[in-house]
Curated annotation (Swiss-Prot):
Belongs to the bacterial ribosomal protein bL19 family. GO terms for biological process: translation. It comes from Rickettsia rickettsii (strain Sheila Smith). SUPFAM superfamilies: Translation proteins SH3-like domain. One of its GO terms (molecular function) is structural constituent of ribosome. This is Large ribosomal subunit protein bL19. Keywords: Ribonucleoprotein, Ribosomal protein. Coiled coil: none annotated. This protein is located at the 30S-50S ribosomal subunit interface and may play a role in the structure and function of the aminoacyl-tRNA binding site. PROSITE patterns: RIBOSOMAL_L19. One of its GO terms (cellular component) is cytosolic large ribosomal subunit.
Length: 138
């Protein structure tokens, strides 16, 4: 392992120390919570910073695994228009990533969804079996 790889691994472990990044792939529906910082100038001339969180939910149509620069592309339909947004996986702006449902697809990149709408743009849901526990046996 060279020095650049070691530096990237250390940086990734620092950024993921306080948040969990789930395993997801193309076709999964995710909800990404993003931190937004607004700047406003008050009447006395002082600058005021306000933080808020905004949720963005959509289908992952592409995922790029490149170490610290890993990213994923999420597509959603907003007011009848398709909106795509790329998120850096290890960015401090990304507060949390939650998988809403898992999809079944046969491609790694789902760019063909851009040309589809309605029923033809649907993705089948992958059902994950629940592990048997002691409570289920009793």
């Amino acid at each position: 392992m060279n020095i650049i790889d070691r530096f990237e691994q250390e940086n990734i472990s620092k950024r993921t120390a306080n948040k969990k990044i789930p395993d997801f792939e193309a076709g999964d529906t995710v909800k990404v919570t993003v931190k937004i910082v607004d700047r406003s100038i008050e009447k006395d001339g002082k600058e005021k910073l306000t933080e808020r969180f905004q949720a963005y939910e959509g289908v992952v149509i592409a995922k790029r695994n490149r170490g610290i620069t890993s990213s994923f592309l999420v597509r959603k339909i907003s007011h009848g228009e398709g909106v795509e947004r790329r998120f850096m996986t290890y960015s401090p702006i990304v507060h949390s990533i939650d998988v809403v449902k898992y999809g079944v697809v046969r491609r790694a990149k789902l760019y063909y969804l851009r040309n589809r709408s309605g029923k033809s743009a649907r993705i089948k849901e992958r059902h994950i079996p629940i592990a048997k526990t002691k409570a289920a046996k009793a």
